[in-house]
Regions:
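A conserved ligand/cofactor-binding region detector
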Residues: 1-752
Length: 752
């Protein structure tokens, strides 16, 4: 029985008579059955990788699974023949609220590639019921509300497996739910998500407020609960320990069921620690092994040979460090092991910068990972060099053999085959259909660089995608885009280092320029998508400024035909899948040396956008691949920025005082026009922040940014030359396939 026959059998009625909800439920169950029929990926070497991460931003799964199972076209045609539109069926599916930003999206891409490459490897995380939060805009400000996603019809499968997890004053019993991870034309792996039996969504009050002390009911409610107070920090520790204790118990259970000796755990298991949230897996595994009769020395050796750590940040504040008294309050049974690990380091090394426990009695999670793991990797070439030579230099001096680079990647199944089908049709027409299995085949598109017909068709594909975005946003939110404008897009977490505030200053510059009578040749539409962490005040202030500008421009008849600002509400994977194919100018403007890699830059590039960015993260490698003519680079280099920090010689106020243009743009934030729309206190806060602090050097780069952006828009008018830039970017994007990244992880670290 083929997939279509199974679908109709599961549905139990004629497709034409079924509702979209009924068809979605039948498709989901048929996909689950087909994934099981594909069978698990099994390692020939008897080794398995477990990828532990606090977040997995997996996006909607229906279409991705249909593509990976090789039945998408079959299902689409079957539905169409019965008067149904697969796109409408897709809209029934809720997006899982299991991630936030690039960290979680990378984890999702990696699981897709691990399965596609036929490697035996599963993800381990938590089953958050309400996600990060659902973002709504009220009074030009972000408001957080719960984001429930779990329905009776769900990709989650109750495994019947659970473990007891001990805390200081009580223990919790877990429930394990699995989500199938289908490989493209390959076997199936699993994403294991642990939950508590006693979770209670009803304890959430106004917005996303809840009793942070009620661990028995709140533990798996929210991803990254507000940690601006002690209760929030303790809840984070409860969450992290619950995740790693379940993960460690599950891993040992699988090993014992396979008949492996736990004395040889490292021969059969590799645990990839994705950022510092899962770091307690190291002492927890040691605890579980010693409880089974293995000596402390041997347990430490086994765990060190089993665990590998991926560093995702250059920001010191993101490298977690927990006060000892907090850990004693939550997991006192781990502290003797952590103290033992710290004592062994202290006995060998005098340098205070490598100690696991610092002079303020805080436990540094990343330091524990580096001492008691066998691999430390960065996620872009520049990032890894900064780790080795600056941020983590004391560790590189001790363990040079542990450090390696694994430049991030994205899955082309979702970020091309699923979300940009018109571009895929164009690619197939011009002979690179093999990219589905070998992304390097995209280079074959360079043969069309002087083919005017192909270039015009490529421009037409982009225009169709812009029109599709216009129709989608108008239907979803009532916002009407001008699809004849240039689409300039910045979508990513709202953080000062990503410098959405610099984009704001460009908008102000352009607004004032238009008011002075200088109309652009072509209208410009600036699109933002971003959530700010609930306790991150400055980030929320920046959103307020963007929304005020959106309102100001919309209601100014002199400016509205030429300049538009749109901030999409509740930016998520589904929205990204609409925005990325329509983007023409990709904003990657973080302060050089601060973005570890970025993957949005790769998605935009793959879909034919041209990058406007700093020499930061993976932008450096994009620049190397496409050449100077096909990317727009501005701003000071990472070396220059690092030197500014070392010398403390950047003073934002000097730029504000000495440059009348910068002063004019910054002061516009508190102009009568803005104060009429916005909250006075909020606008004053962000105005003062830019002048008095500006930790991420917005005013240092803003003039170069504006000049470079104006050059981008001027070059856009030569449509054939622009189309050639698009082709080069698409053709060179093959390097950024997560299949390549995972192949390198397996070659150098996992050996599955």
């Amino acid at each position: 029985m083929n997939f279509s026959e199974k679908l109709q059998q599961t549905l139990g009625k004629a497709i034409k008579d079924a509702s979209n909800e009924e068809i979605y439920a039948a498709l989901l169950n048929t996909v689950k059955e087909a994934a099981a029929d594909k069978g698990r990926n099994i390692s020939e070497k008897g080794r398995k990788v477990y990828y532990i991460s606090a977040e997995f931003l997996i996006g909607k799964l229906l279409s991705n699974n249909l593509i990976n199972l090789g039945v998408y076209d079959e299902v689409r045609e079957l539905l169409a023949a019965n008067g149904k539109d697969i796109c409408e069926i897709e809209e029934v599916e809720p997006e899982p609220s299991l991630g936030n930003g690039g960290l979680g999206r990378l984890a999702a891409c990696f699981l897709d590639s691990i399965a596609t490459l036929g490697l035996e490897g599963d993800g381990i995380g938590l089953n958050y019921h309400l996600g990060l939060f659902k973002q709504v805009f009220e009074n030009h400000k972000q408001k957080e509300t719960p984001n429930p996603w779990i329905q009776n019809t769900s990709w989650l499968t109750d495994t019947g497996i659970g473990f007891n997890v001990p805390f200081k004053d009580f223990s919790l019993h877990s429930k394990l739910y699995d989500i199938d991870v289908t490989g493209y034309e390959n076997g199936t792996n699993k994403l294991h998500l642990f939950d508590i039996e006693s979770v209670n969504e009803n304890i959430v009050g106004d917005g996303i407020s809840f009793d942070k002390n009620d661990i028995r009911e709140n533990l798996t409610l929210f991803l990254y609960p507000d940690d601006s107070d002690k209760q929030g920090e303790l809840l984070r520790i409860y969450q992290q320990y619950f995740m790693v204790s379940n993960g460690a118990q599950f891993i040992l259970k699988e090993c014992e069921e396979k008949g492996y000796s736990l004395e040889e755990l490292d021969k059969h298991v590799v645990i990839q620690i994705n950022d510092t949230h899962p770091s307690m897996v190291i002492p927890e595994l040691i605890r579980l092994l010693t409880a089974r009769g293995i000596s402390m020395d041997k347990a430490i050796e086994i765990v060190t040979n089993t665990c590998a750590y991926t560093n995702h940040t250059i920001l010191a504040e993101a490298l977690e460090k927990w006060p000892i008294d907090y850990l004693e309050a939550v997991v006192p049974h781990l502290m003797p092991i952590i103290r033992e690990l710290a004592a062994r380091v202290a006995a060998k090394y005098d340098n205070k910068d490598v100690q696991i426990i610092d002079e303020w009695n805080r436990v540094h999670m990343a330091r524990m990972d580096m001492h008691y793991g066998f691999s430390v990797n960065g996620v872009a070439a520049l990032h890894t060099e900064i780790l080795k030579n600056v941020e983590l230099k004391p560790f590189y001096d001790i363990y040079p053999e542990k450090f390696n680079n694994k430049t991030n990647g994205i899955t082309f199944r979702r970020w091309l085959m699923h979300c940009d089908k018109k571009l895929v049709e164009w690619m197939d027409k011009y002979g690179v259909s093999e990219f589905r299995k070998d992304a390097s085949k995209l280079e074959g598109l360079l043969a069309q660089i002087d083919n005017e017909e192909a270039l015009n068709e490529l421009l037409d594909v982009k225009q169709q995608n812009k029109t599709a975005l216009k129709e989608y946003l108008e239907k979803e939110s009532g916002v009407v885009l001008n699809d004849n404008a240039i689409f300039d897009i910045q979508i990513k977490r709202l953080h000062e280092y990503k410098r959405q505030q610099m984009n704001v200053l460009y908008i102000i510059y352009k607004y004032l320029d238009i008011k002075a009578g200088n109309k652009p040749k072509r209208p410009i539409t600036m699109i933002f998508g971003a959530k700010a962490a609930p306790a991150y005040i400055i980030a929320k202030d920046i959103i307020h400024v963007i929304l005020c500008l959106q309102e100001l421009l919309k209601n100014d008849p002199e400016v509205a035909p030429y300049l538009q600002v749109v901030m999409v509400e509740n930016y998520n994977v589904t929205m990204a899948e609409k925005l990325i194919p329509a983007c023409e100018v990709s904003e990657q403007i973080s302060l050089a040396s601060k973005e570890a890699s970025g993957t949005g830059n790769m998605k935009f590039m793959l879909n034919g956008a041209v990058t406007l960015g700093t020499e930061d993260g993976a932008n450096v490698e994009i620049h190397q691949l496409v050449g100077d003519e096909n990317i727009y680079i501005f701003g000071e280099s990472s070396d220059q920025v690092i030197e500014h920090y070392a010398k403390s010689d950047y003073v934002a106020a000097d730029y504000y005082i000495n440059d009348k243009d910068i002063r004019k743009w910054v002061d516009f934030i508190i102009s009568p026009e803005m104060l009429k729309i916005g909250d006075v206190r909020t606008l004053l806060e962000i105005h003062a922040e830019l002048i008095q602090k500006d930790w991420f050097m917005t005013l240092l780069d803003v003039k170069d940014y504006i000049q470079t952006k104006e050059r981008v828009f001027a070059d856009y008018e030569d449509r054939m030359t622009w189309a050639k830039k698009m082709i080069v970017n698409i053709a060179k994007a093959g390097f950024f396939s997560s299949d390549r990244t995972i192949t390198e992880y397996n070659r150098d670290i996992w050996h599955v």
